[in-house]
Amino acid sequence: MPLLILAATGPALATGLGAVPVFFMGRRAAAWQPALWGLAAGVMAVASIVGLLQPALDQGSLVAVAGGLAAGTAFLVVTRVALSSTHPHVGQLRGADVRTSILVFGVLFVHSLPEGFAIGTVYASETAGLGLFVILAIALQNIPEGTSVAIPMADAGFSRRQQFWAAVATSAPQPVGAAVAFALVETVSGLLAV
């Protein structure tokens, strides 16, 4: 289990790595924002379609997949509406960039738990080499997520350190999800062996 937690922490650190390019842009981050958002969205969209949507359609019904997509979309719309009617601030920072920072952070934080489930399930299955492949795939996909976190934070005036650790924190659920999934698979496997 300690090796699993360590392995699941790697993709979280990769999310922090995604914040690093934004550090070097300084005031130019705003000019690069459309390109960075586009890059991050493109990578995440392809990862979602190839890594999530296609396997879901292969394993389940179109109705179930459409229901999941609708629920996720509704969650984002409700969250965005709730944030737009408030005036969030962090310290002296206020405005739309703070709102966007909170929304992006929250969505990616929630999104990280199933990634942890994937890591824990693969490690519990003891499939040679697959665990490392899943960790590397999630880590690569997490890099643009870190960029997505850092972009609005840079515009809102957050420090580089805050951008980096906020990006890493969005993936904090991954080790927790990995441990929970690993324990569940081990428990169920033990029950099936009886």
Positions of PLM-derived features:
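Intrinsically disordered, metal-sensing/regulatory segments
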Residues: 1-194
